Amino acid sequence: MTEKLSVEVAYARPDRQWLVALTLPAGATALDAALASGILEACPELDRTALKLGVFGKAAKPDAALREHDRVEIYRPLLADPKEVRRQRAEAGKRMKKGG
C-alpha cells in the first residue's frame, strides 16, 4: 500500500484567497503540492520558475519534502524593493513610522 499525505496549499491576493486540500503520494515536495493545487493555472501572475514557497510561514525550497498535514504557502512577489523604498524616504526627509 502506498502512503498518502494530506496537505493544504494556500495563496492570497487582495481580492481572493485560495486554500486547497490535497492528497499526495508520500515523498511529495512543496512544488508538487503547488502544481497539483491548480492555483498556478488560476493565477497567471505567478511565475513557475521563480515561485517563493513556505511551509507554515517559514521559507521552504521547492524540493522540500512535505509531512502529513503541512500547509504549503505560495508567496506573492514584493511590489517594491524595501531597500529602495527606505532610500526614497530618506531622500525625501521622511521618517518611517514605528511598527509599519
Swiss-Prot record:
Gene3D superfamilies: RnfH-like. This is UPF0125 protein CV_3462. InterPro entries: Mopterin_synth/thiamin_S_b, RnfH, RnfH_sf. Belongs to the UPF0125 (RnfH) family. Pfam families: Ub-RnfH. HAMAP family: UPF0125_RnfH (MF_00460). NCBIfam families: PRK01777.1.
